[in-house]
Amino acid sequence: MAERVEASSVPEGENTIEEREVGAMWELEQKLDQPMDEEANKLNNMYREKGLSMLMLLRLSFQSLGIVYGDLGTSPLYVFYNTFPDGIDDSEDVIGALSLIIYSLLLIPLIKYVFIVCKANDNGQGGTLAIYSLLCRHAKVKLIPNQHRSDEDLTTYSRTVSAEGSFAAKTKKWLEGKEWRKRALLVVVLLGTCMMIGDGILTPAISVLSATGGIKVNNPKMSGDIVVLVAIVILIGLFSMQHYGTDKVGWLFAPIVLIWFLFIGATGMYNICKYDTSVLKAFSPTYIYLYFKRRGRDGWISLGGILLSITGTEALYADIAYFPLLAIQLAFTFFVFPCLLLAYCGQAAYLVIHKEHYQDAFYASIPDSVYWPMFIVATGAAIVGSQATISGTYSIVKQAVAHGCFPRVKIVHTSKKFLGQIYCPDINWILMLGCIAVTASFKKQSQIGNAYGTAVVLVMLVTTLLMVLIMLLVWHCHWILVLIFTFLSFFVELSYFSAVIFKIDEGGWVPLIIAAISLLVMSVWHYATVKKYEFEMHSKVSMSWILGLGPSLGLVRVPGIGLVYTELASGVPHIFSHFITNLPAIHSVVVFVCVKYLPVYTVPEEERFLVKRIGPKTFRMFRCVARYGYKDLHKKDDDFENKLLTKLSSFIRIETMMEPTSNSSTYSSTYSVNHTQDSTVDLIHNNNNHNHNNNMDMFSSMVDYTVSTLDTIVSAESLHNTVSFSQDNTVEEEETDELEFLKTCKESGVVHIMGNTVVKARTGSWLPKKIAIDYVYAFLAKICRANSVILHVPHETLLNVGQVFYV
């Protein structure tokens, strides 16, 4: 090694010898392992918005009923009972409650969500994780720093740029300034995600139980246990059919929900005309004031029941990916909203006259002639609404897995037409057990309603917080507009939240327990994922070490292609050095494969792979980054291996055509390192007679020797007069030779080399970290799907390399 020179002895403006060497090696490493930003194809205007005819818009609005509004549409089944669980004392209380329902529907679903929040979508994708992805593109808030500037060139990587000095730029700088702010943002996002998972348990339970409750209304002597049993049977059937997908029966959803809305709207209009038209005075907000003045604390607590009238709003936002925003706005404004208002007004008109029927207001207000048809349609609508929530939960879990926030689970694509229709067996059975447990344990709608309301209002609060950042960073709204939106949203939602707090001991604790367990799982998994990535980054092998091994890497190069999987998008991973140290042989062609997820909903197939060469051509080492969005799936018939090798062949052709001569952009490592190569072979050969500890000693000495020869590794330009290159081969011949070699290696066999990593807490770590890593994460890693299973790697071509990471 060169002697170290103190900075004080070097003239100003000059670098030390050591600094010059380090700088030269850094420059060389950058040239040999270049950023991957040149060869990806760009699809221009792939997602250009297309104009829709009015007929097509109406058709899509109709279809959106079955997917988007099933959950929101079934709320009339249970709202009034949960608002007055102890009975109705004064008919004016019904008018006050109706007024609250009307303005809740107006402010939250209609104004806030349909016309404001739904515009904050990620290329059509909604939900808390979609908002988080949008924020990750506009600010550096992602905790796993595996992105590269080439990712920003993706067709789907849309973002806006803030003007320097603007309020948006200041907000961005503030958010990126501290690590704890990024973590706090992620915790908020995960909290909303956990509550949405809780919705996947509570929505089917309360919807199906409320719908089947109609049996008892027509037969008052029937035991309540029979109603619960019927609901459980329907729930078991619903979850058992999930693996078939909704592709074959999905066409029924929209007609069922359409008939449901027409039924409740017509019934509501009938009841208004028959019982009491004066309920229409509830459109005056004065009755809200009189309601709270008259009922006091009890009126405030009843907001927990009123809240159920807007449940399903978050599901509406999460499901907007299937339809144009304008179609959703038309369907809600001109059909769903009026039908819901008529339904609630009709029930209120009935309750003003028949206060004793507060427990079954919906079914009791139905005319006898249409009772059983309404019961059948109500049950169908409850199933459709539950199906939409269950499917939404699958999508949320899929997104969480892609963000590194949830253990790997099996995901099955159930439709050939629609990318978003998936099925998660593991999550499905957990949801089913949760639904059955909630339905059988509580039995009463009011207790499940309290739990449901708690989950819904917390998701809304999380959405409001994220919308503030969207309005500042993405939309660049004036801070006064942001302040008005924040104040109005928090005023309404915190009012509801303060009411559900009083009902935590009456069922409201259920979503909190579900959220706590889910948040623990997701937080620990993400924390361990970040620590694994940091460990790999710090332990990656330098290019100088690779160059020191020579063209054959100091190993026996056996025929075939080795795909070495790693989390790193740059640098040589630790798994490679660990592998060749213990097994001194490697394939003739080595490809480091990094499968990474980006904060975009999808990556087009044409832009999926990025390929670069590592080191000189004689090394035959490449890097391939396979990029996916959070909605993309690893399907078994994707033919990942062939697509990767096809992209590699294309890269070789393009690279050869772009080079004027075969040696124009390559770098030689043969000068003065032949001895290093021979010594390395001898060292590894001697390792066969020693134990593992001796292997590591030999490996260390080999690295030390390589480092001592760093000053002998220089670019090809400086060696032009020393090393002779053959200029006889044409570009076509060189390309043909390398492609033929690649084809021969492929025929010899492709081996997938993956790390079987055990993560342990470093000695001296504090107790919570040891529990999280050594017990919670270890358990989750043991029961989750292996990477090889997720990527559909054939078992016969898989080679696992054991590693232990101390984080």
UniProtKB/Swiss-Prot annotation:
Belongs to the HAK/KUP transporter (TC 2.A.72.3) family. GO terms for cellular component: plasma membrane. Residues 1-59, 118-185, 247-248, 321-322, 391-417, 476-481, 529-807 are cytoplasmic. The keyword Transmembrane helix applies. Putative potassium transporter. Keywords: Cell membrane, Ion transport, Membrane, Potassium, Potassium transport, Transmembrane, Transmembrane helix, Transport. The gene is POT9. Residues 81-96, 207-225, 270-299, 344-369, 439-454, 503-507 are extracellular. It comes from the Eukaryota. It is found in: Cell membrane. The chain crosses the membrane at residues 60-80, 97-117, 186-206, 226-246, 249-269, 300-320, 323-343, 370-390, 418-438, 455-475, 482-502, 508-528. GO terms for molecular function: potassium ion transmembrane transporter activity. NCBIfam families: kup. Its main location: membrane. This is Potassium transporter 9. It is a multi-pass membrane protein.
